[in-house]
């Protein structure tokens, strides 16, 4: 029988596998071009050749994109949060730590996310411009402004709903107590850290 922990792990691993499957064709905008490269049905298996990357030492492995990286940093932010009210700020700090891995910028006493020590989470995997731009503003003490409707918010917020199912009631609102609105609100706020158009953060609340 599968435990709740098994299901949460399966959700995160399944998302990472799907990301690794689609990453090689993320920037191929024609299905015809995908068919030329992978056959009539398109890409149906993990591509381990990594011909689209410069990281030749990784050939033989399927790699994840910035989507999985940011998903795991969301999870780390949730784990670091002491209370539900603190979670938004903890997630933002986690995103800033991810930002540092992508830009090679340095900041003292900014070391809450142990996962950034994982080599694959330090590699630059086509990070979205909106995420980098918004986090750069926050990093430099400026308010972020954009009108982005992109999917960069929703692609990383699954851990909020997953973790809310196991956090104790005195630490965080539990979904099983029918307080789904609080989880929806936090998911929207996490997406709004970088994507400020309503269509950039509202889908995260409805995910």
State each model region's role.
Residues 1-207:
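Structured, active/binding-site neighborhoods that engage oxygen-rich ligands
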């Amino acid at each position: 029988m599968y435990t709740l922990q098994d299901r949460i792990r399966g959700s995160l691993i399944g998302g990472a596998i799907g990301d690794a499957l689609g990453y090689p064709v993320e920037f191929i905008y024609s299905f015809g071009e995908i068919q030329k490269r992978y056959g009539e049905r398109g890409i149906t298996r993990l591509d381990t050749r990594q011909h689209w990357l410069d990281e030749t030492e990784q050939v033989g492995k399927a790699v994840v994109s910035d989507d999985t990286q940011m998903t795991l940093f969301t999870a780390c932010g949730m784990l670091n949060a002491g209370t539900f009210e603190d979670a938004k700020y903890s997630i933002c700090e986690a995103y800033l730590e991810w930002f540092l891995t992508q830009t090679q910028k340095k900041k003292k006493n900014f070391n809450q996310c142990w996962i950034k020590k994982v080599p694959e989470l330090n590699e630059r995997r086509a990070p979205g411009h909106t995420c980098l731009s918004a986090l750069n503003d926050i990093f430099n003490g400026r308010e972020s402004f954009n009108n982005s409707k992109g999917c960069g918010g929703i692609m990383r917020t699954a851990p909020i709903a997953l973790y809310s199912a196991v956090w104790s009631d005195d630490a965080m609102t539990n979904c099983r107590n029918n307080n789904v609105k609080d989880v929806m609100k936090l998911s929207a706020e996490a997406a709004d850290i970088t994507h400020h158009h309503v269509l950039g953060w509202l889908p995260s609340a409805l995910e």
